[in-house]
Structure formats: structure tokens, C-alpha cells
């Protein structure tokens, strides 16, 4: 195709579509992190602000205006020969398929593609009389970096029969060559082997769209039940052939020759698969591989956008990596090429997606800097034929000039005179048309005048002079163009003057009549305002009688004038008198007509009076009804007062009960406030930790950006410069590793904060549901601990808890947005650093070997430390198992001792005949020498196997919490040495802040261990002989 460039380049238009929060996000307690500036296409997220061409959704423009503002100009450009592209970009689950309309559900009817199809065929219907159209469509997808045809019947049937468990996965047909991407000699990207279907109606095109949408690869993930697993491109090709008249005054010939102009334009409607993270989507196996390919293609697209959006790189002619993926290869014309492109960035406003939303907005902002070069695509064959035809016409004109012997100057003068004559002819034709348009008005006025005279006077007398005047007026229509004599002009002027006077007189009479009627109406209105029925009736009767009398007198005068006209002679004086009488007669007839109108108006006024009387009667009835209602209302007020007195008495009784419940709820409120305070402290601590990690990451990234490594000149020597260079390399490597660790730390804090926020949101949802059940008077569902705990709270406590949770959710949301912003910047800089090459600053093989040796030494040292930690962990696990075993044995011995003690108490009581309580005191006295009864504030023997609280597993025991001894700070040798020393006490102190056993509750103090456990192994050994000797002494 031959291209005709426009005068200026055009940039890529970018629109942002913000979808609302979905159900899962609301359940998780997600908050809106995207703010739209009122009245401006500007979006804010955290501390970042972006300006685009259009913003839809949220508080921006409604989504229904998206087609008219974004896609409609591109559809109009198709008929002018311009290529166009609409590109939907964004995170998975952000609404790209819904926006484009490539889904197979009913909701897709509101998308861009169905509206484009409707507008396309609507405009074709209006232009098909002048232009011949041919429409072709193709629908392809890029699935796992393979281009597959969605409109190929063989491929679709194969996918329907062989596909199981993977919705819409298109299978490759054996023996058919795969679709190849080709580039023509003029740089146009084409697909070899794809199916192009010719369509002529909207129904056929919609069927192709539905067929491809059903065959498209989709799958279910944790973020989207029907996630697109491929990039889809729906292409509409519009071919049109126009016939243009080549006749012009310059060639001097009007032979009716036509030229044919052939235009071909393409509209690419692209629905990209969304970027995704494996942890969020929960994909594995095939889904994970698909996600890898999707992210790979989107990464290549992002690199292309970054390269084209960087003005410095564009001016320097930097390489644009179109060939890194098949997606960017197919979109080569759409990004920086021959196309008018609109990019729709679909984003999610949820704070849990803040990182992906920020990345999408950054790429969309870069895309606005891309400059495309759209051109009109014409057929080169038709263009060449047009040039040849123009050349033939020029040669024929030259040949005629040479054979005729006329000079070029004379021909040019003749052409200019032809143009001037044509212009003059057009002016004359326009004036002629104006005069002809004025003639029907004159004829109409003359006809009305003739009709009046014919009805009144001219029926009996038709003077010859009047006939001559009429004939002269009728003949004055044509002299405007043809006649040039002075008589015709005079007749025309007289007719116009006569017409003007006639119109002026009629208008004066009408104005006078209007003024008179206005005065009468005003006087009647004044009378009607303070009317008396009898006086008004008398007034109207008198008016009607006056009108009848006046009508009768006018009729008599008219009859008299008609009689006089009939008796008059036909001479000149009689003719003048007849004209005067005719005018008087006409005035009288007008007066009669006016009187008739007055009579009708009086009748109407009488009718209105009757209506007003009826309205007065209705008003009186309504007044009586209102009075009756007033009596009933007073009776009801008395009843309501009595009922209120009874209700107030009952409420006072209830108030006493509520005060009792209020004291109970006050206690619950204090308890809930303590719980809220503890949760706030935990949330604040975690938020501060996340903020510190984010701050460290930001400082490291700024240090990397602002302090690049300075290379020394002498890197080959072994002097001071070489040592300095080696140390700088080591510092640089340590810094890079620290940056990666901090990024991992921030991401870990981000995920942990997300889990905390999800727990808070779940509790908030439960409290709101319980509150709704309470309002409706229903009982919450049973069997759920969350509902049971929430139901036990009072309404005021629930409201206070809900408010507290909402505040904590806002704090958590702000923290998530801040961390997402830092993670986005870290990933962006890391990606830019990776693209430039992490190891480009290594200038020699010696530097690389030194850095590799340093990395090897660091790795070996880290492995050794890791082995030592593993050994310590294993020893701690063994020690923990031993402690648990000893604890269980001690518990069994304690139970056996208690059982034996009870038996001996019963035996002593039976022998002595005393109550069991006194024997219990004797048994307690026998156990006093036990070292376990020593006050805990002074000393406490360390007995392996004795611990408080519930025994936890090894993983919980080894949790690196502040309440526990950090790993590596307590030597296992010291513990083993303590276990081997017999008889030596292990003293616990109140000021000791590190314990080998973690205590679950605050009231569990290690120095009160002797108060919880009353018996030990030594106590049992010492108490057994004394208990055995006691019965012997008694005997």
C-alpha cells in the first residue's frame, strides 16, 4: 500500500478505566487506594500522581462515554484510510475482557468491540451508494508464545473434541503449517496462514467474534474464575473503492472521466492477558507455565513502551526490542508505527493490588510519550494509474496546443476568462433564484385581494381599470429577468407600492383592534376580581344585548350599502362612490366578525363562571370534610396521649432493666477497649517495622542511584589502586545483596500486613453481619465461633469495635500502599539495572576473578554458619524433646503421688477415726522439708522436665520472638553442664529477661513455679518413708 503522511505525528492516547471493588475484595476489607481529581483526568495513588487523556470509573467520567471519546474517532479514521489500534492493558482481574467485549457472556455487549461493529456497519449503510466496501475479520491469540487461529474451523473442531479441563485451548492440527509472522518489503507486519473471513453484515461479524471468544484459552485462578490465558487480537480490515470525477476547468474538457481510489485500513482490537503473581493466583503446573509466558510477553511489551517513551533514546535512535516476543512483533505498527493507537489501562482500586496498579499506571504514563506516524493507505496500482492518466491528459493538452499554434500564455488567459465567466454566471443564477423565490409571495397577495373583491363587490361590478391593473401586476413577474423597458418597471413599482400600503393598513387595523380588545379584557379582569354573581350576570347580559344590537345595526348598514351600490350608475363618479361604499362595507364586515368573536368570548366567560361556581361548591365541601377530619384528629390525639402515657410507664420499667444491662455492657466495653488497645499496639509495631524496612530499602536504592561506582584508571597493577578497586567491588556487591535482602524483607512485611488486614476485615464483616441480624430481629448462625463471640457483645460495644476495626483497616491500607509504591520503584530500578547489565562495570578478567573469589568466600562462610545453626537447632530440638519427656514423666509421678496421698489419708482417717481434713494437715506437715517449698523470690531449683503451660511443638518453640532466647545466644554446653552437676541449684531472678521456656500468659512467672507444682521427685522420695512410718506409730 502506498502511504500519504499527514502533516503532524500523533501520540498514543491513554485512558484509564477504574473498575469497582468486587465481592472478594470487599470481604477482605480492601479500601480504595486510587483517587481521581474532580474535573481533571488525573489519578493519584499514594504519593504518585498521573495525568492521562481520559479517566473512567470511580469519580471520573462514566464508562458509557468510553466508546464515543476513545474508539469512535478511530472508526471514523478507518473510512479515511488510517490504521487504528485499541489496546487493553492491566493486571489480571482488572476488567480488560469486560472493557473490550471479547467475553462470551451477555455483559460483553457493552464492550468496545460490539459498539465498534455497530458503528462500522451503520456508517457503511450510509456510504454504500458512493463507495464499494469489502470487510474482512481475523481473530488470533498468542498462547504460550504460539500464534493460533481462533477462526479456523479445523482448529476449533479439534479443540472441541480433544480439550478437557482447559477451557478453550486451541489444539494444533497435524499437517497444517503453523502461523508465521512476516514483514513485507515496505515494513508491514502480516500473518502467513491465518484465516480471514469476509463478512457483509453485523450478524456475521458478531458470529466470528463469538466463535473466537469461545475458542480462546481461559482458566480459573484464585483471582479470577475465568482468567484469559492468552493475548487476543481481533482485526477488522476495511477495503473501499471510491470513484472520483477528474473533470476540472484547467483541462478545458468535460468528458465525464472518473478515477478510482482504493483504500485499505485495519483496526486491531487487542485484549491482553493480565500480569499475575503465582502467589496471588495460586497457579501451578500448566497454569504456572501459562503465567510465565504471559509475564514474559508483557515484560517485552513494557520494554518496548519504555524504549519508545524515552525521548532521549528516541532521538538517539536507540534499538527498540520488537523481536523479543511475538506480541510486540505483531504490535510493531501500533506502537511507534503506522497507526492511531488508544491504550486503555484497566486498574483495580483495591489496596491489596496497589503494587500492580502503580506499575500499570507507570507504563500507561510512558505510553503517552510514544509518537506514531499514521498515514493514509492507498493501493499503489490505483495511484500509479492515476498518475499515468494525469500525465496522458497533460500530454494531450500540450499536443493540442502545439498543433493549434496557440501559445501557452493565450491558453492561460482563456482559462482565466473561463473561470471568471463561470463565476459571473453563478452570481447571476443566484440572483435569478432570489427574484423567483420572491414572486410567489406577490402572486399570493394579489390572489387574496382578488378573492376578497370577488366575494364582496366585484361579483356585481368589474371595472375595466381594475382588470388592467391585475393584468399589469401579473405581467410584472417576468420582466425581472427579461424586460428592460421603462413601462414594465413602473408597473412593477406601482404594484409593490400598492401592496405595501395594503399591508400597512391591514396591520394598523389589526393593531388598533388588539389594543381595544386588550383594554376590554383588562376592565373585565378587574370586574371579575371582585365580582358579584348577580351583577356579573347582569353585566354579561347587557354586553350580549349591546353586541346583538350593534350586530343588527351593522347588518342593516351593510344591506343598505349593498342596495345603494346596486342602484348606482356606471359612470366615473358612481364608480368612485362605489369604491368608497365598498371600503365601508369591508370595514363593516370586519366589525361584524369582531362582534361575533366578542359574542363567543362572552359565552366562554359564562362557562368559566359556571366552572368557578362549581369550584366554589367543591371548596365548600372540602372545608366541611376538613372540619370533620379535624374532629377525628382531635379524638385520635386523645387516644395517642393515653397510649403514650402507658408506653412511658412501661419504658421506665424497661429503663431500670437497661441500666443494669448498661453496667454489664460498660464492663464489656472496658474489656473491649483493652483488646483494641493491644491490637493497635501490635498493628502499630508491625506498621513501624514495615516503615523501617521500606525506609532502609529506599535509602539503599537512592544510594545505588546517586553513588555509582567510580572506576579507577589503573586496574591492572597490584598497588594501592588495585586494592582500592577490589574493596570498592566488594562493597558494591555487599550493597547489592543488602538491597535484595531488604526487598525480600519489605515483600515479606507486605504479605504479612495483607494477612493481618484480611483477619481484621473478616472480624469486621462478622460484626456487621451480627449487627444486621440484630436490626432485623434474627438470630445469627450457630456453630461459628466468630458469630458466637460477636453476639455476646452489646450493641454499643459492637459499634465501638466496628469503628476501631475500620480505623485499623485504614492504617493498614495506607501502609500497604506505601510499601507497594516502594516495591514498585525497587522492581523498576532493578529491571532497568538488569537491562543495562549488572556486570558491565567489571573492566577486566582480574576484577571478575577477584569478585568471584570474594563471592565464593562469602558463600562458604555463610554455608558454614548455616551448618552451625542447623547443629544448634538440632541440639535444641533434642533438648526440647528431652524436656517434654521429663515433663510427662514428672506429671505421671505427680498424679501417682496425689493418688497415693489420698489413699493414705483415707487409711489414716479410718484408723484414727478423725475427719479427713485433719489428716490432710498432718500429711502437709510431713512434706514441709521439701526444697520446693523455699520462697520463689529467693531461689528456685532448675529441674529438667518441669515446665508450665501447654507443651508446644518444635516449630513454635524455635520461633524467634522477643520473649524467647535468641538462637545462638545460649550455649548448649552450659545447659548440659547444668544437667550434669548434681545438687547444684539453678537460680532464676526477677530481673532476668531471657528464659529457655516461653511462657504463654503474663501471669505465668518462672519464679512462681514452686507455687504451681507442689510435689517434685525429691519431695516424693522424702515423704514416702515418713508416710509409711506413720501407721506403725499409730498402731
UniProtKB/Swiss-Prot annotation:
<feature type="binding site">
    <location>
        <begin position="90"/>
        <end position="97"/>
    </location>
    <ligand>
        <name>ATP</name>
    </ligand>
</feature>
<protein>
    <recommendedName>
        <fullName>Kinesin-like protein KIN-4A</fullName>
    </recommendedName>
</protein>
<dbReference type="InterPro" id="IPR036961">
    <property type="entry name" value="Kinesin_motor_dom_sf"/>
</dbReference>
<dbReference type="GO" id="GO:0055028">
    <property type="term" value="C:cortical microtubule"/>
</dbReference>
<dbReference type="GO" id="GO:0007018">
    <property type="term" value="P:microtubule-based movement"/>
</dbReference>
<dbReference type="GO" id="GO:0010215">
    <property type="term" value="P:cellulose microfibril organization"/>
</dbReference>
<keyword id="KW-0067">ATP-binding</keyword>
<keyword id="KW-0493">Microtubule</keyword>
<dbReference type="GO" id="GO:0005524">
    <property type="term" value="F:ATP binding"/>
</dbReference>
<keyword id="KW-0175">Coiled coil</keyword>
<feature type="domain" description="Kinesin motor">
    <location>
        <begin position="11"/>
        <end position="370"/>
    </location>
</feature>
<keyword id="KW-0206">Cytoskeleton</keyword>
<comment type="function">
    <text>Kinesin-like motor protein involved in the control of the oriented deposition of cellulose microfibrils. Its motor activity is directed toward the microtubule's plus end. It possesses the potential to drive long-distance transport of cargo along cortical microtubules. Regulates cell wall mechanics during cell elongation, by the regulation of primary and secondary walls deposition. Contributes to cortical microtubule-mediated trafficking of cell wall components.</text>
</comment>
<keyword id="KW-0961">Cell wall biogenesis/degradation</keyword>
<feature type="coiled-coil region">
    <location>
        <begin position="881"/>
        <end position="911"/>
    </location>
</feature>
<dbReference type="InterPro" id="IPR027640">
    <property type="entry name" value="Kinesin-like_fam"/>
</dbReference>
<dbReference type="GO" id="GO:0008574">
    <property type="term" value="F:plus-end-directed microtubule motor activity"/>
</dbReference>
<dbReference type="GO" id="GO:0005737">
    <property type="term" value="C:cytoplasm"/>
</dbReference>
<dbReference type="GO" id="GO:0008017">
    <property type="term" value="F:microtubule binding"/>
</dbReference>
<dbReference type="GO" id="GO:0003777">
    <property type="term" value="F:microtubule motor activity"/>
</dbReference>
<dbReference type="InterPro" id="IPR019821">
    <property type="entry name" value="Kinesin_motor_CS"/>
</dbReference>
<dbReference type="InterPro" id="IPR027417">
    <property type="entry name" value="P-loop_NTPase"/>
</dbReference>
<keyword id="KW-0505">Motor protein</keyword>
<keyword id="KW-0963">Cytoplasm</keyword>
<keyword id="KW-0547">Nucleotide-binding</keyword>
<dbReference type="Pfam" id="PF00225">
    <property type="entry name" value="Kinesin"/>
</dbReference>
<feature type="coiled-coil region">
    <location>
        <begin position="408"/>
        <end position="436"/>
    </location>
</feature>
<dbReference type="GO" id="GO:0030705">
    <property type="term" value="P:cytoskeleton-dependent intracellular transport"/>
</dbReference>
<comment type="similarity">
    <text>Belongs to the TRAFAC class myosin-kinesin ATPase superfamily. Kinesin family. KIN-4 subfamily.</text>
</comment>
<dbReference type="InterPro" id="IPR001752">
    <property type="entry name" value="Kinesin_motor_dom"/>
</dbReference>
<dbReference type="GO" id="GO:0009832">
    <property type="term" value="P:plant-type cell wall biogenesis"/>
</dbReference>
<feature type="coiled-coil region">
    <location>
        <begin position="504"/>
        <end position="707"/>
    </location>
</feature>
<keyword id="KW-0813">Transport</keyword>
<comment type="subunit">
    <text>Homodimer.</text>
</comment>
<feature type="region of interest" description="Disordered">
    <location>
        <begin position="704"/>
        <end position="724"/>
    </location>
</feature>
Amino acid at each position: 500500500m502506498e502511504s500519504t503522511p499527514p502533516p503532524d505525528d500523533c501520540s498514543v492516547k491513554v485512558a484509564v478505566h477504574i473498575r469497582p471493588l468486587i465481592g472478594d475484595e470487599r470481604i477482605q476489607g480492601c479500601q480504595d487506594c486510587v483517587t481521581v481529581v474532580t474535573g481533571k483526568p488525573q489519578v493519584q495513588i499514594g504519593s504518585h500522581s498521573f495525568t492521562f487523556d481520559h479517566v473512567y470509573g470511580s469519580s471520573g467520567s462514566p464508562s458509557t462515554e468510553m466508546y464515543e471519546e476513545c474508539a469512535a474517532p478511530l472508526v471514523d479514521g478507518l473510512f479515511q484510510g488510517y490504521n487504528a489500534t485499541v489496546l487493553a492493558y492491566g493486571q489480571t482481574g482488572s476488567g480488560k475482557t469486560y472493557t473490550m467485549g471479547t467475553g462470551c457472556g451477555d455483559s460483553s455487549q457493552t464492550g468496545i468491540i460490539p459498539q465498534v461493529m455497530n458503528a462500522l456497519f451503520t456508517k457503511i449503510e450510509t456510504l454504500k451508494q458512493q463507495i464499494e466496501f469489502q470487510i474482512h475479520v481475523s481473530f488470533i491469540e498468542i498462547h504460550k508464545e504460539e500464534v493460533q487461529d481462533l477462526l479456523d474451523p479445523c482448529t476449533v473442531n479439534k479443540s472441541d473434541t480433544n480439550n478437557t479441563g482447559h477451557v478453550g485451548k486451541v489444539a494444533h492440527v497435524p499437517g497444517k503449517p503453523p502461523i508465521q509472522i512476516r514483514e513485507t518489503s515496505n515494513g508491514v507486519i502480516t500473518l502467513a496462514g491465518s484465516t480471514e473471513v469476509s463478512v457483509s453484515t453485523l450478524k456475521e461479524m458478531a458470529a466470528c467474534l463469538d466463535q473466537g471468544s469461545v475458542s480462546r484459552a481461559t482458566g480459573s485462578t484464585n483471582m479470577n474464575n475465568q482468567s484469559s490465558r492468552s493475548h487476543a487480537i481481533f482485526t477488522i480490515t476495511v477495503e473501499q473503492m471510491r470513484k472520483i470525477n477528474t473533470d476540472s476547468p484547467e483541462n478545458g474538457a468535460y468528458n465525464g472521466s472518473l478515477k478510482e481510489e482504493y483504500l485499505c485500513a485495519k483496526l486491531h482490537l487487542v485484549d491482553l492477558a493480565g500480569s499475575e503473581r503465582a502467589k496471588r493466583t495460586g497457579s501451578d503446573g500448566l497454569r504456572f507455565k501459562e503465567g510465565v509466558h504471559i509475564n514474559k510477553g508483557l515484560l517485552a511489551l513494557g520494554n518496548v513502551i519504555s524504549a519508545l517513551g524515552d525521548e532521549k533514546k528516541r532521538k538517539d535512535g536507540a534499538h527498540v526490542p520488537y523481536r523479543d516476543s511475538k506480541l510486540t512483533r505483531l504490535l510493531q505498527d501500533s506502537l511507534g508505527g503506522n497507526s492511531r493507537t488508544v491504550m486503555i489501562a484497566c486498574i483495580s482500586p483495591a489496596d491489596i493490588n496497589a503494587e500492580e496498579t502503580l506499575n500499570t499506571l507507570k507504563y500507561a504514563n510512558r505510553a503517552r510519550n510514544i509518537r506514531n506516524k499514521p498515514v493514509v493507505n492507498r493501493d499503489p496500482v490505483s495511484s500509479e494509474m492515476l498518475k499515468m492518466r494525469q500525465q496522458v491528459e497533460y500530454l494531450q493538452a500540450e499536443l493540442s496546443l502545439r498543433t493549434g499554434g496557440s501559445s501557452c500564455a493565450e491558453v492561460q488567459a482563456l482559462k482565466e476568462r473561463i473561470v471568471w465567466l463561470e463565476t459571473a454566471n453563478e452570481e447571476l443564477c443566484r440572483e435569478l433564484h432570489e427574484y423567483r423565490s420572491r414572486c410567489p409571495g406577490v402572486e399570493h397577495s394579489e390572489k387574496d385581494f382578488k378573492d376578497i373583491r370577488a366575494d364582496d363587490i366585484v361579483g356585481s361590478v368589474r371595472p375595466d381599470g381594475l382588470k388592467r391593473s391585475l393584468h399589469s401586476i401579473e405581467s410584472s413577474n417576468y420582466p425581472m429577468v427579461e424586460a428592460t423597458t421603462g413601462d414594465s418597471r413602473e408597473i412593477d413599482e406601482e404594484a409593490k407600492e400598492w401592496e405595501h400600503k395594503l399591508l400597512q393598513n391591514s396591520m394598523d387595523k389589526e393593531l388598533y383592534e388588539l389594543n381595544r380588545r386588550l383594554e376590554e379584557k383588562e376592565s373585565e379582569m378587574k370586574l371579575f376580581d371582585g365580582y358579584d354573581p348577580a351583577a356579573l350576570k347582569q353585566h354579561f347580559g347587557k354586553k350580549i344585548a349591546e353586541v346583538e344590537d350593534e350586530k343588527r345595526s351593522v347588518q342593516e348598514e351593510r344591506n343598505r350599502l349593498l342596495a345603494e351600490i346596486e342602484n348606482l350608475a356606471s359612470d366615473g363618479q358612481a364608480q368612485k362612490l362605489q369604491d368608497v361604499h365598498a371600503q365601508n362595507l369591508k370595514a363593516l364586515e370586519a366589525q361584524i366578525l369582531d362582534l361575533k368573536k366578542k359574542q363567543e368570548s362572552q359565552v366562554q366567560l359564562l362557562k368559566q363562571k359556571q366552572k368557578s361556581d362549581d369550584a366554589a361548591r367543591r371548596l365548600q365541601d372540602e372545608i366541611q370534610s376538613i372540619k370533620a377530619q379535624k374532629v377525628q384528629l382531635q379524638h385520635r390525639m386523645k387516644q395517642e396521649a393515653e397510649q403514650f402515657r402507658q408506653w412511658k410507664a412501661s419504658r421506665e420499667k424497661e429503663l431500670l432493666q437497661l441500666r443494669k444491662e448498661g453496667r454489664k455492657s460498660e464492663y464489656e466495653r472496658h474489656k473491649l477497649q483493652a483488646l483494641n488497645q493491644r491490637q493497635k499496639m501490635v498493628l502499630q509495631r508491625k506498621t513501624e517495622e514495615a516503615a523501617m524496612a521500606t525506609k532502609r530499602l529506599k535509602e539503599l536504592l537512592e544510594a545505588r542511584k546517586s553513588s555509582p561506582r567510580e572506576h579507577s584508571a589503573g586496574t591492572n597493577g597490584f598497588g594501592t589502586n588495585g586494592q582500592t578497586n577490589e574493596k570498592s567491588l566488594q562493597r558494591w556487591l555487599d550493597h547489592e545483596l543488602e538491597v535484595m535482602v531488604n526487598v525480600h524483607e519489605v515483600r515479606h512485611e507486605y504479605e504479612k500486613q495483607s494477612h493481618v488486614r484480611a483477619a481484621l476485615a473478616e472480624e469486621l464483616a462478622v460484626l456487621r453481619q451480627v449487627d444486621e441480624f440484630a436490626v432485623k430481629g434474627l438470630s445469627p448462625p450457630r456453630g461459628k465461633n466468630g458469630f458466637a463471640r460477636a453476639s455476646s457483645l452489646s450493641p454499643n460495644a459492637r459499634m465501638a469495635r466496628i469503628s476501631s476495626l475500620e480505623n485499623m483497616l485504614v492504617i493498614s491500607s495506607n501502609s500497604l500502599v506505601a510499601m507497594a509504591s516502594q516495591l514498585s520503584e525497587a522492581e523498576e530500578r532493578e529491571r532497568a539495572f538488569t537491562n543495562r547489565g549488572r556486570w558491565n562495570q567489571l573492566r577486566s578478567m582480574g576484577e571478575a576473578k577477584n569478585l568471584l573469589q570474594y563471592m565464593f568466600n562469602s558463600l562458604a562462610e555463610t554455608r558454614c554458619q548455616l551448618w552451625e545453626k542447623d547443629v544448634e537447632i538440632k541440639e535444641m530440638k533434642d533438648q526440647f524433646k528431652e524436656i517434654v519427656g521429663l515433663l510427662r514423666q514428672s506429671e505421671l509421678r505427680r498424679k501417682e503421688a496425689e493418688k497415693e496421698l489420698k489413699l493414705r489419708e483415707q487409711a489414716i482417717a479410718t484408723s484414727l477415726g478423725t475427719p479427713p481434713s485433719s489428716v490432710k494437715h498432718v500429711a502437709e506437715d510431713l512434706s514441709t522439708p521439701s526444697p520446693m517449698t523455699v520462697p520463689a523470690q529467693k531461689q528456685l531449683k532448675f529441674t529438667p522436665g518441669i515446665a508450665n503451660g501447654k507443651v508446644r511443638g518444635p516449630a513454635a518453640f524455635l520461633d524467634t520472638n522477643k520473649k524467647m532466647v535468641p538462637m545462638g545466644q545460649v550455649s548448649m554446653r552450659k545447659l548440659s553442664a547444668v544437667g550434669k552437676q548434681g545438687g547444684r541449684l539453678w537460680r532464676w531472678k526477677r530481673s532476668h529477661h531471657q528464659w529457655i521456656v516461653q511462657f504463654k500468659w503474663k501471669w505465668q512467672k518462672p519464679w512462681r513455679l514452686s507455687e504451681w507444682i507442689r510435689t517434685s521427685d525429691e519431695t516424693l522420695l522424702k515423704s514416702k518413708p515418713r508416710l509409711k512410718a506413720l501407721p506403725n506409730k499409730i498402731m
